[in-house]
């Protein structure tokens, strides 16, 4: 595995790989690697002969009073995990390389980025989209693998690549959970043992919605209210949002249509740790 820190060097390597007709897949991360990231790498390796892993804690996607400065950066551990996963290239630039003096261009997203995460974290997705586009241009990948856990981010990136005719295929990797149902996340390390127990309520709320949908409930407001009531039973839980959206477009829906796919998406504070989660549902067809 080669570790590259210079964007121009990474571009040159990727260009040479393309000239040799090598299929390239990229997995973009902020580091603090875990089993979820390893599953993305595994999927990338199944799809392409060369895998580039990027590690970059992107300052442009963090808002004021968020955890940019304390976000975990265990680079030695990350590089060891990447090597063990048989990554070909680890691209790990610093911020001065990605946003040099005078940098002033960025992506401005549309409605899909304005709701939910976008409402609670203004400009977050503009920062995400800008760095994702830069990494696509630097790594020159044919395929980019993203996790289902950040479902709205995935929808924003798909919208961007479609709108801007970016020649790259977006692959979605399934969300991974620990045995207690908590979605695997780098931020889980912030949770105390008691908070970790309470964090399992996110999965219970998503599972309750699944049960109710399979029973025939199609009123989004009722499903959301039931999820909120369950979450509010935990003493350290504070809700940013709970919503139901169409699975691909991320448009919010009041009534779920039979045969269509939707997601319940939620962002919950457990103590001082903000967790996001989601689950996809297919609404049963009505029997004749």
UniProtKB/Swiss-Prot annotation:
Its annotated function is as follows: Catalyzes the condensation of pantoate with beta-alanine in an ATP-dependent reaction via a pantoyl-adenylate intermediate.
Q: Which residues bind beta-alanine?
A: 61
Question: Which key words are in the record?
Answer: ATP-binding, Cytoplasm, Ligase, Nucleotide-binding, Pantothenate biosynthesis
Q: Which family does it belong to?
A: Belongs to the pantothenate synthetase family.
Q: Tell me what reaction this enzyme catalyses.
A: (R)-pantoate + beta-alanine + ATP = (R)-pantothenate + AMP + diphosphate + H(+)
Pathway(s) served: Cofactor biosynthesis; (R)-pantothenate biosynthesis; (R)-pantothenate from (R)-pantoate and beta-alanine: step 1/1
Gene Ontology terms, cellular component aspect?
A: cytosol
Q: Name one Pfam family in it.
A: Pantoate_ligase
Question: What does the miscellaneous comment read?
Answer: The reaction proceeds by a bi uni uni bi ping pong mechanism.
Q: Where in the cell is it found?
A: Cytoplasm
Name the active site residues: 37
SUPFAM superfamilies per record: Nucleotidylyl transferase
Q: What is its EC number?
A: 6.3.2.1
- Domain of life from the UniProt record: Bacteria
Species source reads Prosthecochloris aestuarii (strain DSM 271 / SK 413)
Chain positions recorded as ATP binding sites? 30-37, 147-150, 176, 184-187
The entry lists its GO molecular-function terms as:
ATP binding; pantoate-beta-alanine ligase activity
Enzyme class, first EC level, given as a word: ligase
Q: Which PANTHER family match?
A: CYTIDYLATE KINASE/PANTOATE-BETA-ALANINE LIGASE, PANTOATE--BETA-ALANINE LIGASE
Name a single GO biological process: pantothenate biosynthetic process
Q: How does it assemble?
A: Homodimer.
- Protein residues bound to (R)-pantoate: 61, 153
Put simply, this protein is called Pantothenate synthetase
